[in-house]
Structure formats: C-alpha cells, structure tokens
C-alpha cells in the first residue's frame, strides 16, 4: 500500500520504538482512506498538555491526519498483535481496527502512543470491516475524559472525526475515527500472545522493552522480571480500587483489556453504577455476571495470574521454582487491593487515620445502602454535606445507628470535623457520567448533529469535585423506566 506521508506542523513529534521489537509483535499497516472527514470534537486541554498545534489540527490537513488520509512524515503506522482470554476463553486477537501512528514525545519528554481507532481493516480484523461508529467513539471520548478528571489512570481521547461513510451494524450508522492517546498499548494479552506463539527470546525482548519504557527505576540486583510482575500487580491493585471507589463497571475485563502500565483501556460496555449493588452488570453479553462490579477485584487477580504464567520462563530456570515465585507475587494482590480500597473509603468518610474496625464500619454502610437501594455517588455526596435526609436512607433506623458510630469514629482522630469535610469533598465526586446523561448527549450529537449537549456534559465532568450548583442537573437520578441500563461493545 502506497504511503501518504506529509510534512504538516501539527506539533506531533513521533518515534516508534515499538518497531524495534521482533516483527511477531506488529504488522506495518497504513490507515484506510475515508471519503469526507470532518472534525466532530477536539480535546483542547489535552492538545495543550501534549504540546500540539490546535489551529493546525483543526485545518483540512490536520483533520486528514486525524482521519488517516495523510500520515505525518515521521510516522511508522503499525497494527499490534496480541491475544487474550475473553470471558475466560483464550483467543488470538490484535488491533482489528486500530493503527498506531507512533509515539509522540512531549516537550516535557513524556512518551505517548497516538492511535487511530476505527481506521479500517488490518491483518487482525478477523472478518470485520475495521470501522467504528460515531456513537461509540463519542462515548469513549466522554467516559475516558471523565475518568481522567476523576484522577483514574486512563487512556485519553484527543479527537473524534466523522468519516463521511455509512457502516453497517444492525442498522446503518455514521462512521467515525477516535484518536486515542495512551502511555502504551502493551497488554497482558500481548504477553499471552508471545508466550503462546513466540520464542523465549521474543518474550524476553518484550519484557525488557516494557521494563525500559514503564519501569526504569529498579534495583539491578533484583530479578528484573519478578520486579516487572510485582509492579504490574501494584498498578492494577491501585487501578481497580479506584474503579470501585467511584462505582465504575468496566464490563469487559478480558486480559487483552488489562494494560501493563495500569491505565484503563477500551470503554465498550462500561458504565457507572447508580444504585449500589455489587452484582451490577451493564454489558448485554455478560449474562452470567463474570465482570459484575463486585467481582472486578477477583477478575483482576485472575488476569494477573495469566500474566504471571507468561513470565514463568523468565522468572527462574527451574519451572517449579518459577511457579512458586509467581504464586507468591500474585498472592500479594488481594492485600494491596484491599489496602488501596480501604484507604480510599476512609477518605470518602473523612477518616484520616487507621483503626482495625474501619472495615466493618465501611461494610456496614454499604450493606445498608444495598438494602435500601441507595444511590452510590449521591449517598457519599449527602454524607459530605450532611443532608442524608434527602436520600432514601433518611429516617432509617439502621442508618441512624451507623451514623452515630461514624460520628464517634470521627471524634477519635486529631483532625477537625472541618478537615474531614474537606477530605470528603476531595474524595466524593459531585458528578459522574450518569448513563442517562451520556445517552442524552450522544443522541443529540449523533441524531441531530448538536454537540452542545455533549460539550456541557464534558464541562461538568471536567470538574467532578467542584460541588457547584451548575452540576446539579448531572447528578439527578434516572427515571425508573431507564434504570435497567444496558451497554453494548461498540467501541
């Protein structure tokens, strides 16, 4: 395929260190041309952070780059190979509709993948058309930016362009391409892929590359591959705890959707929980609740065990010793996760120090919330501003008893009630991407071409801890008829 390389001063400063790996890990692939690209949304704060030129990206040439019609001169476009356990079953995968243009080096020296998602067929498309629809791309843009504002590690969304194409799914939909920005796209599934179909030398090359790119600070006397495993476990323990603290349900925690660098990736059937229920599932295909809200920590541990299995040949020359090393490392996940989660829950309740009974206090509150169908986000918001009477828990005997114990707990710390209130305000968001508000924004954009609803939503979501009056509209609960919300893997 003939390359369409151009010199356009977008500010992109691209390298592609990933192509230094053996060719088993990728295939060189140009994006498909699209007939009539138009800019739908551009992320100006992210553009500024990356040191890019917003004016040029808005131009015809800039939009052509975001659509894949033109390729920056220094780009080496590739699709990445990986495998994965999907709902527990192993399969070969790869970038079926995504092209990595390269790695942008920011003025601060940070390295970020720049990927076009929905850019056409690749060798890994497995019969698909490689295209993406506008609605799911806008949805990923909204959710990923909300996650970033909440302080949760995530891939970012730089832009969405419409392609001028119609793509066939169950109905005819408008085509679109998302420009995704990530610290990298190395997944547990990348290691599974080379473990199954590569050599030990290729596995070592990937592990060494990952260490160099993401985990440079290490004691050289340590086993570097054990260090890699331990660091990935730590990052995932932190990430999953942060998901749980805001009621985020990923929906498709396959091993190909677990990044090595600890970023949330692939926002297909994700959603935020309204009413607190550990069994909350939104994905239309997760009929057995494998990826339910309350099961996410267990699934993370399962995925990490699959990652550890890929590293066994590097952990020790003796297979039995390698298994022991891996099992010891994986056994740390539960404790690491719980410590992160407890720390976050204490903050949500204004608690600064640790007491052994804190876990019981927290679990009792969650049990009461579950019993009475309390909204997760708004309950903690009500506790923050001491207006619980406005929630379903107001006047409930069990809650009143719990509230008294909580107040007694707050008096047993040196910090003042005012300090506790400030801690709670910075730990309990006033606004999350409520499913009905996201759908409202998508419907206006996709069906009517009106992006103003989405822009207002994004503005509210960009300041989740502002607790401003203007955000009240976005914190209202859905009507009962819309509570049984289902998501589909369109991204």
From Swiss-Prot:
ATP binds at residues 94, 96-97, 117, 129-130, 180, 187, 266. It holds the Pfam family SelO. Mg(2+) binds at residues 257, 266. The active site is at residue 256. Coiled coil: none annotated. Its EC number is 2.7.7.-, 2.7.7.108. It catalyses: L-seryl-[protein] + ATP = 3-O-(5'-adenylyl)-L-seryl-[protein] + diphosphate; L-threonyl-[protein] + ATP = 3-O-(5'-adenylyl)-L-threonyl-[protein] + diphosphate; L-tyrosyl-[protein] + ATP = O-(5'-adenylyl)-L-tyrosyl-[protein] + diphosphate; L-histidyl-[protein] + UTP = N(tele)-(5'-uridylyl)-L-histidyl-[protein] + diphosphate. InterPro entries: SelO. Its cofactor is Mg(2+); Mn(2+). Nucleotidyltransferase involved in the post-translational modification of proteins. It can catalyze the addition of adenosine monophosphate (AMP) or uridine monophosphate (UMP) to a protein, resulting in modifications known as AMPylation and UMPylation. This is Protein nucleotidyltransferase YdiU.
């Amino acid at each position: 395929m003939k390359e369409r390389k151009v010199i356009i001063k977008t500010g992109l400063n691209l390298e592609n260190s990933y192509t230094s790996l053996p060719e088993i890990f990728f295939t060189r692939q140009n994006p498909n041309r699209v007939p009539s690209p138009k800019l739908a949304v551009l992320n100006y704060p992210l553009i500024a952070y990356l040191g890019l030129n917003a004016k040029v990206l808005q131009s015809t040439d800039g939009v052509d780059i975001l659509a894949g019609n033109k390729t920056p001169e220094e780009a080496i476009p590739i699709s990445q190979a990986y495998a994965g356990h999907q709902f527990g079953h192993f399969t070969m995968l790869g970038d079926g509709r995504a092209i990595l243009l390269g790695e942008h080096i920011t003025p601060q020296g940070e390295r970020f993948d720049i990927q076009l998602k929905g850019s056409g067929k690749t060798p890994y498309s497995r019969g698909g058309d490689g295209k993406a629809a506008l609605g799911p791309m806008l949805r990923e843009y909204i959710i990923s930016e909300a996650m970033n504002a909440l302080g949760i590690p995530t891939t970012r969304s730089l832009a969405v362009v419409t392609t001028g194409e119609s793509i066939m799914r169950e109905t005819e939909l408008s085509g679109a391409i998302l420009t995704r920005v990530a610290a990298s796209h190395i997944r547990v599934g990348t290691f599974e892929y080379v473990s199954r179909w590569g050599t030990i030398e290729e596995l070592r090359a990937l592990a060494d590359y990952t260490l160099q790119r993401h985990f440079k600070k290490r004691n050289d006397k340590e086993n570097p591959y054990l260090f890699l495993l331990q660091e990935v476990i730590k990052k995932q323990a932190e990430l999953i705890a942060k998901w749980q603290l805001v009621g985020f349900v990923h929906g498709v925690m396959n091993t190909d959707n677990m990044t090595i660098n600890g970023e949330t990736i692939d926002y297909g059937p994700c959603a935020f929980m309204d009413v607190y229920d550990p069994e909350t599932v939104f994905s239309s295909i997760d009929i057995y609740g494998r990826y339910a809200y309350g099961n996410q920590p267990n699934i993370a541990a399962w995925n990490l065990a699959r990652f550890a299995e890929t590293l066994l040949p590097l952990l020790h020359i003796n297979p039995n010793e390698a298994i022991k090393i891996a099992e010891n490392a994986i056994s740390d996940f539960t404790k690491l996760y719980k410590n992160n989660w407890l720390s976050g829950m204490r903050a949500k309740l204004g608690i600064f120090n640790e007491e052994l009974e804190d876990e019981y206090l927290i679990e009792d509150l969650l049990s009461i919330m579950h019993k009475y169908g309390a909204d997760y986000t708004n309950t903690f918001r009500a506790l923050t501003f001491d207006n619980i009477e406005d929630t379903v828990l107001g006047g409930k005997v069990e809650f009143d008893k719990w509230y008294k114990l909580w107040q007694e707990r707050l008096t047993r710390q040196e910090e003042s009630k005012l300090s506790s209130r400030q801690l709670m305000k910075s730990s309990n968001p006033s606004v999350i991407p409520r499913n009905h508000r996201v759908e409202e924004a998508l419907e206006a954009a996709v069906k009517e071409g009106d992006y103003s609803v989405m822009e207002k939503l994004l503005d509210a979501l960009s300041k989740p801890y502002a607790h401003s009056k203007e955000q009240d509209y976005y914190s209202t609960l859905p009507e009962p008829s819309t509570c049984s919300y289902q998501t589909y893997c369109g991204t």
